[in-house]
Amino acid sequence: MPSLLIADDHPLFRAALRQAATDAVPDTTVAEADSLDGVLSALDTDPGIDLVLLDLHMPGNHGLAGLAAVRAQHPEVAVVVVSANDDPRVVRRALDHGAAGYLPKSSGLEELRDAVRAVLACEQWLPGSLRAAVARTQSSSTDTDLAARLASLSPQQFRVLTFVAQGLLNKQIADRLDVQERTVKAHLSAIFERLGVRNRTQAGVILRELELSDPARQLAD
């Protein structure tokens, strides 16, 4: 029985995704989260989740960092990015960072169903309206290299990197992870080496490079 996690901070959109998912695969079990912390907690708690429908912009996630976090900490889980942003360059970046599909929020219910069916069948999925444009969009060598470097981090190292990007000190990170401070320092040394950086500031910048502006918020402004 497939298991799916819907991650979006808008209840009405989560309800629409739930309906589409259960229509597409009737025996699917569906859980929900409204923040990136909720996503990672659900994945830690339930190792049986097969697919995450991940909003690019919700509490704790402002771009591709959430995708990178899920892929780094749970590489066995497929992720379909859900976003109001249908820029082919953003779609290409999401695919380069490990997304199994990309679903614009303007998609109809049938496209939602198609996406769920395809990705659960281990296929990559894009809406027909974006396929040609994305195919013409070249991957950025910088993005490809960044994705590879982030993928080289262990789940715990990625958590440490996330806290570093948030500006937390070693003691604070140790308290959050319930480990000793020297363990955090060891993780940082490994992170610096794998990312090819020299200090915390450079490491934090790498993760913040994955941030994207929110088109829905821009329209509201």
Predicted regions located by residue number:
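Short, flexible helix-to-coil linker/hinge segments that flank and couple to helix-turn-helix
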Residues: 91-96, 105-151, 155, 209-212
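Active-site residues of response regulator receiver
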Residues: 55-56, 83
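Acidic catalytic/metal-coordinating carboxylates
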Residues: 35, 60-65
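Basic, Lys/Arg-enriched C-terminal extension of HTH/homeodomain DNA-binding domains
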Residues: 190-221
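Short amphipathic alpha-helix used as the core "switch/output" element in two-component signaling
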Residues: 64-76, 206
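Acidic, metal-coordinating helix/loop segments flanking the phosphotransfer/catalytic sites
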Residues: 32-51
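Recognition helix of helix-turn-helix DNA-binding domains
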Residues: 167-202
